[in-house]
């Protein structure tokens, strides 16, 4: 093989597709018995008509990622449902804060809609420029100077104590729930950057949900890989270096066990010092009916941030970053059947997907905690629970080896890691190991189902190893 890709997550498959389209022979090797990495969907072990998204469930970047946009997922058979409500944030003893696809409606329902519009309106008007900047390779001149000038002051405003300038407790909670996707202390530049991009995308393109589950995205990439002569092998763990060029969609530390003494001493030391971030505990529910939310608007919100107020979310993220369980942890929830009724089985059962933010490696079963938090905003929720599938953070790596300690970002979310990657290198997708490259979320631009880490790794490999440019993606 010209190129072997280890790991079949969205980044690995992106790199594989690009290399195959360039005319190279490509093989993808996946340790799990099913491909897709963080974008897999599997049937419930008891109720086969109900399927659970194993890691990611909602995909704000499916339409906006520069790679997915150029590749055109929909042209490759991925059907995306874009709900009217992108996300919402229930609040205690007051109406929820709701992020509609329509920014006008969002602002009309917030206490101070003008503040929200001032923050996000100009970004939504330049969606491509903003996404190109925030998902850039961190080494090129900003692709859009106007976008950079719009983002910079807002990044400082929401990534520092200046974030108090966003007015209205509901708006503050609405933004903080999105920023908390980074599982990092708030305010910070990292959480602000993610928050600005995701909140902006809600108004620019919406938060799409793949029909049939997240698996639709890797399935489309796999079909294209095979159409261009590539191969996929599942159920095979890589323990020795494959021949030829190898692109690793893995945690950086995996290279230590694969290459062992062949890892240069300084690089080995850097990898051993590599820091993983806080984790998530996964709790999937099978429900018999619709959740009885106090605020009826939430019945139309596929994505919910159940962290309470901005103050409560900031406290919870601070506690988790310090290695302590929060009394009220940040919980993300998704009801994909709201956008995709096909996720409801013939008996009316449907999935509820949730994550709870916890310290790295936590062994706690968070099912009761998550149930209590949902019940706080939807009395009677417990009565709907048919089954619970709970995975503590310490066990998340069993179904995805990259999620060490439950860290879905594959590395601590801080500004240094976001800019530099797993170790200080001019090109973070390279390694000092001959013909070995990285393309996981540990490399820029970081976590998320966007394919851009794989895109940049493939671009590097084509240029350095084969003297080739990027192929056509359509």
Indicate residue ranges for each PLM-predicted region.
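Active-site-proximal substrate-binding core of FAD-dependent oxidoreductases
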Residues: 464-474
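N-terminal glycine-rich phosphate/pyrophosphate-binding loop and immediately adjacent elements
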Residues: 2-129
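Helical element adjacent to the flavin cofactor pocket in flavoenzyme catalytic cores
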Residues: 197-238
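Flavin-binding catalytic cores
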Residues: 115, 290-291, 324-326, 362-401
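A conserved FAD-binding loop/helix module that cradles the flavin
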Residues: 439-462
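A glycine-rich dinucleotide-binding beta-alpha-beta segment and adjacent secondary-structure elements
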Residues: 172-185, 328-332, 380-444
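Rossmann-like flavin
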Residues: 92-190
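Mid-domain catalytic core of redox enzymes
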Residues: 234-345
